[in-house]
A protein has these predicted regions:
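C-terminal motif of bacterial Sec signal peptides marking the signal peptidase cleavage site
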Residues: 15-17
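Bacterial signal peptide processing site
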Residues: 19-21
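Pre-active-site segment of Zn-dependent metallo-hydrolases
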Residues: 25-39, 47, 51-90, 97-101, ...
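Active-site neighborhood of phospho(di)ester-bond hydrolases with catalytic His/Asp-centered motifs
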Residues: 62-66, 82-93, 110-114, 174-177, ...
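Active-site HxH/HxHxD metal-binding segment of metal-dependent hydrolases
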Residues: 73-135, 139
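Binuclear metal-ion centers of metallo-dependent hydrolases, dominated by the metallo-beta-lactamase
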Residues: 124-138, 158, 211, 215-255
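Active-site-proximal loop/helix segments of hydrolase catalytic cores
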Residues: 148-216
């Protein structure tokens, strides 16, 4: 397991401010660990492709859990059972009913877009622009995720899929889902703490589009994900060359 403790301007170490329990994620996947201004712990596990796990203290959120993808079998048994499962949209690399069942426990909330719920036959529907309080100091807002390049619009139509912006005691994390650098991003919060942007043309963004989106969002940390064969090193190189000040973290696990 790789563990990183990352402390940015809005993720200050204030251990005396909070006695909340936080169990380290003990998994083979890379984990980044942050502290909120209120002293809570945020852990993010880089599982594979579009699948990540976010733990706020001991409250675990699985995003797009898929057990088998790209010839790999993911070790979800290494994680605690999820308190919440969030699905961005209904494609097979995001929605897998068997994996949802495997990571869930009694009382797990499963939240997804309408087409995913229709396809799965279960789930709590959440649409673009809607917000939910998942737990104390844990909120999520569904934001648009769609294609805009001519000829690609049918892959992810506008108004269907979700990205998710999490507010974790003021620590902002964005998982884009399958999207391009859509105009809506201009209205998203600027300076979010951690942003996951999908980058695998022709389904989501090119490396150039990912750079453009990052320059609009201006996050503290960017993690390109849902990568496929994208040259993720180019994303980092271009942002560094532009003097963006964005800390770009690259993971082969997210191909």
């Amino acid at each position: 397991m790789k563990q990183f403790l990352l402390l940015g301007a809005s993720a200050l170490l204030m251990l005396s401010a909070c006695g909340a329990k936080s169990t380290p994620l003990d998994t083979r996947y890379p984990v980044e660990t942050y502290k909120t201004k209120g002293g809570h712990t945020v852990q993010v596990a880089m599982i594979h492709h579009g699948s990540i796990a976010v733990q706020f203290d001991d409250f675990l959120i699985q995003i797009d859990p898929v057990q088998n993808h790209g010839g790999q079998t993911m070790a979800y048994e290494e994680f605690p059972k999820a308190d919440v499962v969030l699905i961005c949209h209904e494609h097979g690399d995001h929605l897998n009913k068997e994996t949802i069942a495997a990571v869930s426990k009694e009382g797990t909330r499963v939240i997804m877009n309408a087409k995913s719920a229709q396809q799965a036959g279960f789930g709590e529907v959440m649409g673009n622009g809607e917000s939910l309080e998942l737990a104390k100091k844990v909120k999520v807002t569904a934001v648009p995720a769609y294609n805009i390049t001519p000829g690609r619009e049918q892959m992810h139509p506008q108004g269907n899929g979700n990205g998710y912006i999490f507010d974790l005691d003021g620590f902002l994390l964005y998982a884009s889902g399958d999207t391009e650098d859509i105009p809506d991003m201009a209205e998203f919060p600027k300076g979010m703490d951690v942003v996951f942007l999908s980058a695998n043309q022709p389904y989501t963004m090119t490396a150039e589009q990912c750079v453009k989106a990052a320059q609009v969002l201006k996050p503290k940390v960017l993690v390109p994900y849902h990568l496929g064969n994208t040259d993720m090193a180019k994303i980092k190189a271009d942002l560094d060359a532009a003097g963006s000040g964005i800390d770009v973290h690259l993971y082969e696990e997210l191909r």
